[in-house]
Amino acid sequence: MKIICLLIFVLLILPSVLAQENEDITGKKAPNFKLINLDGKYVELNKETGNGPVLLSFWATWCKPCLEEMAEFNKIYKEYKDKGFTVLAISTDAEKSVAKVKPYIKSKGYRFMVLLDTNNEVARKYYAQQIPFTVLIDKNGNIVYSHLGYMKGDEQKVEKLVSEMLEK
């Protein structure tokens, strides 16, 4: 009987313990950061936001939904890059798997910037507790959208927002 009671207690409590909601960062100023890109050069967020919207995509090579989402973001990037849209794909791969990032990006032919956040310092600034995690920043450096996870069709919301921001 004690085991059954304990099991029921654990099953009732476990979902609330496991549920980690990302803090709502929409409407806040985007924290600045400086990360290394795949060419070994530093990229600073504040130097990217003045031209138009910036999409931050937190991802990893081992995350299948992340890879699916990045393919969709690449399509959006191709459509709007000449109008000032920037994508910063922030790899959260740890030191042991970061060597897979550059070959993967090259194999897909992605042209947007890929940054390395191996210690998750920037991910923590944006409360990206899980991936994929997407943040859209306007040209004034304000966060206008954030989203955890990926399901086919999520990219349509991002594209709509990017299009609207570029029309202003």
Predicted regions and their residues:
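Sec-dependent signal peptide recognition
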Residues: 2-8
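N-proximal helix/coil linker or "cap" segments that precede and/or mark the start of modular domains
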Residues: 5, 15-32, 49-50
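Short, acidic, Ser/Thr-enriched surface-loop or helix-capping motifs
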Residues: 24, 37-38, 137-138
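A short beta-strand-turn-helix
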Residues: 33-54
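Short pre-active-site segment immediately N-terminal to redox-active cysteine/selenocysteine motifs
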Residues: 52-54, 58-62, 130
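Structural microenvironment flanking redox-active thiols in thiol-disulfide oxidoreductases
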Residues: 67-108, 118-125
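Thiol/disulfide oxidoreductase modules built on the thioredoxin-like
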Residues: 103-110, 118-163
